[in-house]
Amino acid sequence: MKTVSQLIDMKQKQTKISMVTAYDFPSAKQVEAAGIDMILVGDSLGMTVLGYESTVQVTLADMIHHGRAVRRGAPNTFVVVDMPIGAVGISMTQDLNHALKLYQETNANAIKAEGAHITPFIEKATAIGIPVVAHLGLTPQSVGVMGYKLQGATKEAAEQLILDAKNVEQAGAVALVLEAIPNDLAEEISKHLTIPVIGIGAGKGTDGQVLVYHDMLNYGVEHKAKFVKQFADFSVGVDGLKQYDQEVKSGAFPSEEYTYKKKIMNEVNNND
């Protein structure tokens, strides 16, 4: 399992870091078997596995439930679990209680929290021993305000993102996710931080990349963002399901190959 120190060492050696989301035991098991460096249990599970329209409906209980399953599936991978909307920003005491509950009950290596406004939370969480990954740029929990669009696209916005990135690092963040920002801006931020910067829709100048499992494998998704490359096609599973339906209806399944050979009814009838 990678440690924070090893991830920083990868950055220093310019070894790219791979990160993929996982939301359950089998997907986590696959991601670990593939040798991916980090797993993100993202609140995107709201759309990908729970069928919500956004991350807004995702609860702390949801994140704990799925985080536990992922840890069981990937016991030897660095796992980061999202703080869902409402888990940060109520009061510092409640925020830290939520963070501690999520961190302890999922056995994660770190938690992730969105936005530039959470630097005081990062400081406090770090002080009590909870590693925090920050998330800037497009933050899905705020799409109701900012929308799904490129962030940092003006001079002022870019300068603010650079400042925000420095602030979350100074607050103690162990890594930073940058989403949907210009490539050159992401590269500039990555160069000026000592912590690993993981990009999603931020070009190749970051220290690593993260993609959503269901997006990159075309597994039950209707829309994919511009920055998503499809690496496999899990949608072919529908063809298998259709064939199963046909074979059940025709009586072709189960054939002898898939049937136990033991005969018991002669013995039952002989006892009558």
UniProtKB/Swiss-Prot annotation:
Cofactors that this protein relies on: Mg(2+)
Residues where Mg(2+) binds: D43, D82, E114
A molecular-function term among this protein's GO annotations: 3-methyl-2-oxobutanoate hydroxymethyltransferase activity
EC nos: 2.1.2.11
Details of cofactor binding: Binds 1 Mg(2+) ion per subunit.
Residues that span the membrane, as ranges: none
Active site: E179
Main location: cytoplasm
Location in or out of the cell: Cytoplasm
Enzyme kind, highest EC tier: transferase
Keyword Magnesium among record annotations: yes
Pfam family, one: Pantoate_transf
Reaction equation(s) it catalyzes: 3-methyl-2-oxobutanoate + (6R)-5,10-methylene-5,6,7,8-tetrahydrofolate + H2O = 2-dehydropantoate + (6S)-5,6,7,8-tetrahydrofolate
Family: Belongs to the PanB family.
HAMAP family assigned to the protein according to its UniProt record, in alphabetical order: PanB
Assembly and binders: Homodecamer; pentamer of dimers.
Record protein name field: 3-methyl-2-oxobutanoate hydroxymethyltransferase
